[in-house]
Curated annotation (Swiss-Prot):
This is Photosystem I subunit O. One of its GO terms (biological process) is photosynthesis, light harvesting in photosystem I. The chain crosses the membrane at residues 61-81, 110-130. It is found in: Plastid, Chloroplast thylakoid membrane. PANTHER family: PHOTOSYSTEM I SUBUNIT O. It comes from Arabidopsis thaliana. It comes from the Eukaryota. Involved in the balancing of excitation energy between the two photosystems I (PSI) and II (PSII). Disruption phenotype: Reduction by 50 percent in state transitions due to a disturbed balancing of excitation energy between the two photosystems. Short flowering delay. Residues 1-51 form a transit peptide. Residues 82-109 are lumenal, thylakoid. The gene is PSAO. Keywords: Chloroplast, Membrane, Photosynthesis, Photosystem I, Plastid, Thylakoid, Transit peptide, Transmembrane, Transmembrane helix.
């Protein structure tokens, strides 16, 4: 019985298969291209293996400058009881610094102005980055 397991045997149809494989093709698919691994491209990033391109942040100071101006202009309009959001925020900073070692109370208006002002600033910077980079890279 041990001899039957030790002898090489082939399953009919698999051992000596003469079936040739043809690449899958369809009229719905583009012509087949060999997929290239970007990590294996010679000299793609100076011989180092990276998963992201080196300039992934795509930092541009135009976005920061225009975004800050784009937020300071509307937040400086006196729309809240004759005062602007920027003015209220900076005034609340001054009143909280008047008693400096003591932190602002949780009921202080400082927290409302801080969160509102920075939320508007970060939204303006985010949309500015999307719009500026989308325009320079021809997304729209």
């Amino acid at each position: 019985m041990a001899a039957t397991f030790a002898t090489p045997s082939t399953v009919i149809g698999l051992g000596g298969s003469s079936i040739t494989t043809k690449p899958f093709s369809s009229s719905f698919l583009k012509p087949t291209l060999s997929a290239k691994n970007p990590l294996r491209l010679a000299g793609a990033s100076g011989g180092r293996v990276t998963c992201f391109e080196r300039n992934w942040l795509r930092r541009d100071l135009n976005v920061v400058g225009f975004g800050l101006i784009g937020w300071l202009a509307p937040s400086s309009i006196p729309a809240i009881n004759g005062k602007s959001l920027t003015g209220l925020f900076f005034d609340s900073i001054g009143t909280e610094l008047a008693h400096f070692p003591t932190p602002p109370a949780l009921t202080s208006q400082f927290w409302l102005w801080l969160v509102t002002w920075h939320l508007g600033l970060f939204l303006c910077l985010t949309f500015g980055q999307i719009g500026f980079k989308g325009r320079t890279e021809d997304y729209f």
